[in-house]
Amino acid sequence: MRPEERWNHVGLVQREEADSVLEEPINVDEEDGGLQICRVCGDKANGYHFNVMTCEGCKGFFRRAMKRNVRLRCPFRKGTCEITRKTRRQCQACRLRKCLESGMKKEMIMSDAAVEQRRALIKRKKREKIEAPPPGGQGLTEEQQALIQELMDAQMQTFDTTFSHFKDFRLPAVFHSDCELPEVLQASLLEDPATWSQIMKDSVPMKISVQLRGEDGSIWNYQPPSKSDGKEIIPLLPHLADVSTYMFKGVINFAKVISHFRELPIEDQISLLKGATFEMCILRFNTMFDTETGTWECGRLAYCFEDPNGGFQKLLLDPLMKFHCMLKKLQLREEEYVLMQAISLFSPDRPGVVQRSVVDQLQERFALTLKAYIECSRPYPAHRFLFLKIMAVLTELRSINAQQTQQLLRIQDTHPFATPLMQELFSSTDG
């Protein structure tokens, strides 16, 4: 064989097994004929390629040979080599001859431009599949859209995010830095340490600082005393009671706007509100929470939890702070917040609820609406677990509600601070 006629087959076989599938094969069921074999080499076939049932290797070989237009010669000068899985790389000329004899057609090979179009199409379909809603997600029904709209309207009417109507509230007796507590407050801190220890058990030591911004631009700060035995919260109790009562009234009005709530017997309305008001307020407060600073921005008022030993991370040991940070990380939308409030409100297992089955059906309706909203408005699969996370958060919120309420009741026994509305809501815990 002359040197110029020598056949160099390296370029045809070096990527044979790794050739990417650019032309999608026509898949063949193995029900009738059993295992399908390649018509060229006898290896396991994976579909029709260029008009013939072949394996991936022979498909790639034929495609490269035709596109490169290489002149192949049988190194054994016979042209009748047997092509099998083991021998298919030994004689490329006879392998190509076998491909053509089997019926593979050059005209069915896609051009480079067509290959690029196919590649782009495949990428686009994969992207659309990722962004598409999960199986079964059909979007929101008209009823679900109406439920969300009613909740959004109720939220807008009853949630004063700027606290513009929060007036005539009580402030700590000392509302500036570096000063001692008045004697009347100092005297109230002298009860038996063991009693106070029982009141504040299971709580993480922390201080609450308050900043009030005046309409004229002036700023007042309240910093609790330097000592950290837990009693520094006492001067703030009347003010915190006023803030809580203001939020409680907004939540109660929110419930009254919901038509399904108004249709319930008055006894069930009261029972549901007694059980859920605190939880719904926590959800509303979360929308105003800054995880980086641990601060709640409430219009002209700002509240900040401070670790007396320094460092914000330790505050995460407190269940309530940990909850707010965990919920904030979900980056929920307002629609999801109001649906969470509704799910919390319509809890059939609250003490005193009579029409439990009716309330249970309503809660399920709001839960399914939340699930449908997430499926049709959140990218899938990035948020495929968001609904489950939200339901887990609501379960955790029930536990926090019980813990915080019991602690407030213990404080109320020794340092009465609760408003009449708070006392009425707290009474539900005895059920």
UniProtKB/Swiss-Prot annotation:
<dbReference type="Pfam" id="PF00105">
    <property type="entry name" value="zf-C4"/>
</dbReference>
<keyword id="KW-0010">Activator</keyword>
<keyword id="KW-0479">Metal-binding</keyword>
<dbReference type="InterPro" id="IPR035500">
    <property type="entry name" value="NHR-like_dom_sf"/>
</dbReference>
<protein>
    <recommendedName>
        <fullName>Nuclear receptor subfamily 1 group I member 2</fullName>
    </recommendedName>
</protein>
<dbReference type="GO" id="GO:0071357">
    <property type="term" value="P:cellular response to type I interferon"/>
</dbReference>
<dbReference type="GO" id="GO:0008270">
    <property type="term" value="F:zinc ion binding"/>
</dbReference>
<keyword id="KW-0539">Nucleus</keyword>
<dbReference type="GO" id="GO:0030154">
    <property type="term" value="P:cell differentiation"/>
</dbReference>
<dbReference type="GO" id="GO:0005634">
    <property type="term" value="C:nucleus"/>
</dbReference>
<keyword id="KW-0238">DNA-binding</keyword>
<dbReference type="InterPro" id="IPR050234">
    <property type="entry name" value="Nuclear_hormone_rcpt_NR1"/>
</dbReference>
<keyword id="KW-0862">Zinc</keyword>
<dbReference type="GO" id="GO:0000122">
    <property type="term" value="P:negative regulation of transcription by RNA polymerase II"/>
</dbReference>
<dbReference type="GO" id="GO:0071219">
    <property type="term" value="P:cellular response to molecule of bacterial origin"/>
</dbReference>
<keyword id="KW-0675">Receptor</keyword>
<feature type="DNA-binding region" description="Nuclear receptor">
    <location>
        <begin position="38"/>
        <end position="104"/>
    </location>
</feature>
<dbReference type="GO" id="GO:0004879">
    <property type="term" value="F:nuclear receptor activity"/>
</dbReference>
<dbReference type="GO" id="GO:0045944">
    <property type="term" value="P:positive regulation of transcription by RNA polymerase II"/>
</dbReference>
<dbReference type="GO" id="GO:0006355">
    <property type="term" value="P:regulation of DNA-templated transcription"/>
</dbReference>
<dbReference type="GO" id="GO:0042178">
    <property type="term" value="P:xenobiotic catabolic process"/>
</dbReference>
<dbReference type="GO" id="GO:0045892">
    <property type="term" value="P:negative regulation of DNA-templated transcription"/>
</dbReference>
<keyword id="KW-0805">Transcription regulation</keyword>
<dbReference type="GO" id="GO:0016604">
    <property type="term" value="C:nuclear body"/>
</dbReference>
<comment type="function">
    <text>Nuclear receptor that binds and is activated by a variety of endogenous and xenobiotic compounds. Transcription factor that activates the transcription of multiple genes involved in the metabolism and secretion of potentially harmful xenobiotics, endogenous compounds and drugs. Response to specific ligands is species-specific, due to differences in the ligand-binding domain. Activated by naturally occurring steroids, such as pregnenolone and progesterone. Binds to a response element in the promoters of the CYP3A4 and ABCB1/MDR1 genes.</text>
</comment>
<dbReference type="GO" id="GO:0006805">
    <property type="term" value="P:xenobiotic metabolic process"/>
</dbReference>
<dbReference type="GO" id="GO:0016922">
    <property type="term" value="F:nuclear receptor binding"/>
</dbReference>
<dbReference type="GO" id="GO:1990837">
    <property type="term" value="F:sequence-specific double-stranded DNA binding"/>
</dbReference>
<feature type="zinc finger region" description="NR C4-type">
    <location>
        <begin position="74"/>
        <end position="99"/>
    </location>
</feature>
<dbReference type="InterPro" id="IPR001628">
    <property type="entry name" value="Znf_hrmn_rcpt"/>
</dbReference>
<dbReference type="InterPro" id="IPR013088">
    <property type="entry name" value="Znf_NHR/GATA"/>
</dbReference>
<feature type="binding site">
    <location>
        <begin position="282"/>
        <end position="285"/>
    </location>
    <ligand>
        <name>hyperforin</name>
    </ligand>
</feature>
<feature type="binding site">
    <location>
        <position position="244"/>
    </location>
    <ligand>
        <name>hyperforin</name>
    </ligand>
</feature>
<dbReference type="Pfam" id="PF00104">
    <property type="entry name" value="Hormone_recep"/>
</dbReference>
<comment type="similarity">
    <text>Belongs to the nuclear hormone receptor family. NR1 subfamily.</text>
</comment>
<keyword id="KW-0863">Zinc-finger</keyword>
<feature type="region of interest" description="Hinge">
    <location>
        <begin position="105"/>
        <end position="142"/>
    </location>
</feature>
<feature type="short sequence motif" description="Bipartite nuclear localization signal">
    <location>
        <begin position="63"/>
        <end position="89"/>
    </location>
</feature>
<keyword id="KW-0804">Transcription</keyword>
<dbReference type="GO" id="GO:0010628">
    <property type="term" value="P:positive regulation of gene expression"/>
</dbReference>
<dbReference type="GO" id="GO:0030522">
    <property type="term" value="P:intracellular receptor signaling pathway"/>
</dbReference>
<dbReference type="GO" id="GO:0045111">
    <property type="term" value="C:intermediate filament cytoskeleton"/>
</dbReference>
